[in-house]
Each structure stands twice: as C-alpha cells, then as structure tokens.
C-alpha cells in the first residue's frame, strides 16, 4: 500500500466521519 493510497483513505475516512457527525448533530443525537 503506497503512502498516496493511505493518504486518500485517511482523507476520505475523516470526511465521512465529519459528515456523519454533522448529520447526527442535526438530528439531535
């Protein structure tokens, strides 16, 4: 696994987590 692939996976996971937290926050959870 290259560093570029690892970097992309990290960016995507952080982005997905931030979206999930925003959605949860809007639903009052």
Swiss-Prot record:
GO terms for cellular component: cytochrome b6f complex; plasma membrane-derived thylakoid membrane. It comes from the Bacteria. The chain crosses the membrane at residues 3-23. GO terms for biological process: cytochrome complex assembly; photosynthesis. It is found in: Cellular thylakoid membrane. Keywords: Electron transport, Membrane, Photosynthesis, Thylakoid, Transmembrane, Transmembrane helix, Transport. InterPro entries: Cytochr_b6-f_cplx_su8_sf, Cytochrome_b6-f_cplx_su8. It is a single-pass membrane protein. GO terms for molecular function: electron transporter, transferring electrons within cytochrome b6/f complex of photosystem II activity. Belongs to the PetN family. Component of the cytochrome b6-f complex, which mediates electron transfer between photosystem II (PSII) and photosystem I (PSI), cyclic electron flow around PSI, and state transitions. The 4 large subunits of the cytochrome b6-f complex are cytochrome b6, subunit IV (17 kDa polypeptide, PetD), cytochrome f and the Rieske protein, while the 4 small subunits are PetG, PetL, PetM and PetN. The complex functions as a dimer. This is Cytochrome b6-f complex subunit 8.
